[in-house]
């Protein structure tokens, strides 16, 4: 009886943990999450969030599901010598635990794109 109860509990835990989802996108300044998707975690994997910085200035973030080929490995201030970027990676294993920030307002995106267009015209002048 005890073995049957243990087997049932194990099956229930596997069923519940098999449906954990993570956010997947590249998060950029002003634009927010680009190409926003949802991915399902494979057994034994975790959601990941990697923030990239130049000095103390945030450049971008990557949110995704860890995979057997690229598992989530927590790291603080890991520096890429080639690009000079510093990476901080965090891992979590709850449903949608790597939640992205809310989508930017259309007005803010319009201001950014208008400024970018103005800069482009100024450089061409």
From Swiss-Prot:
A lipid is attached at residue 99 (GPI-anchor amidated serine). It is found in: Cell membrane. It comes from the Eukaryota. Residues 1-18 form the signal peptide. The keyword Cell membrane applies. GO terms for cellular component: plasma membrane; protein-containing complex; side of membrane. InterPro entries: LY6_UPA_recep-like (IPR016054), LY6G6C (IPR039237), Snake_toxin-like_sf (IPR045860). N-glycosylated. Residues 20-111 form the UPAR/Ly6 domain. It holds the Pfam family UPAR_LY6. Keywords: Cell membrane, Disulfide bond, Glycoprotein, GPI-anchor, Lipoprotein, Membrane, Signal. Disulfide bonds join 22-47, 25-33, 39-65, 92-97. Glycans are attached at residue 88. Residues 100-125 form a propeptide. It is a lipid-anchor; GPI-anchor. The keyword Membrane applies. This is Lymphocyte antigen 6 complex locus protein G6c. It comes from Bos taurus. The gene is LY6G6C.
